[in-house]
A protein has these predicted regions:
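Residue-level signature of transmembrane alpha-helical entry/exit and packing/kink sites
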Residues: 74, 120-128
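Short, hydrophobic transmembrane alpha-helix segments
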Residues: 18-33
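Central hydrophobic cores of alpha-helical transmembrane segments in multi-pass inner-membrane proteins
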Residues: 34-57, 81, 135-139
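Transmembrane alpha-helix boundary signature
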Residues: 49-55, 82-122, 140-144
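Membrane-embedded catalytic scaffold of the fatty acid hydroxylase/desaturase
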Residues: 127-167
Length: 167
């Protein structure tokens, strides 16, 4: 069980990125979800004062990390970033198309959270900040893949290009 938890913690950033992207997709006040998640993450980080040294090793010196799982997580982030960019592009388009109005109700998620066609200027700012924060955090995946050769390096360049940083 401990080894599972050690490896599952590497899903924290991808889950936060997906949730922030969903907030931008939903729009309205939810477009600010990424900004809120950043501060929640900072508070948790400061409160725990726990610094990780990696997954660690067993008594025989073998890593407890699942290399395949960790690599798939990094590669999985490329389609997530592409979708995040497309969602943000749609939000900018809907802002322009509806003149800064929310427009019609598209759907209601769980009967609680309304999703509108358009987006207001204030919520577009929230969407932009949320996108910038979490696509910026996502640069880590592109950076780590840039240490590889072949296919992984190509994927890293694409990821870095999506964030506007190809160092």
């Amino acid at each position: 069980m401990g080894q599972i938890l050690l490896n599952l913690r590497y899903l924290l950033a991808p889950i936060l990125i997906i949730v922030a992207g969903a907030g931008v997709l939903i729009g309205g006040i939810m477009a600010w979800l990424g900004v809120v998640l950043l501060f929640v993450g900072l508070i948790v980080d400061i409160a725990t004062k726990f610094e990780t040294t990696g997954v660690g090793y067993d008594s025989e010196g073998n890593t407890l990390g699942w290399a395949g799982f960790q690599n798939l997580t990094m590669y999985f982030m490329l389609p997530i970033f592409v979708l995040f960019q497309l969602v943000m592009a749609w939000r900018v388009y809907s802002f322009m198309a509806f003149g800064g109005a929310e427009g019609e109700l598209v759907t209601s998620i769980f009967g609680i959270i309304p999703m509108y066609e358009g987006i207001t200027a204030v919520n577009l700012i929230g969407a932009t900040l949320s996108s910038g924060i979490f696509i910026g955090i996502g640069i880590i995946y592109g950076h780590e893949l840039s240490h590889t050769k072949g296919f992984g390096f190509v994927i890293s360049r694409i990821m870095m290009a999506l964030s506007g940083s190809a160092h």
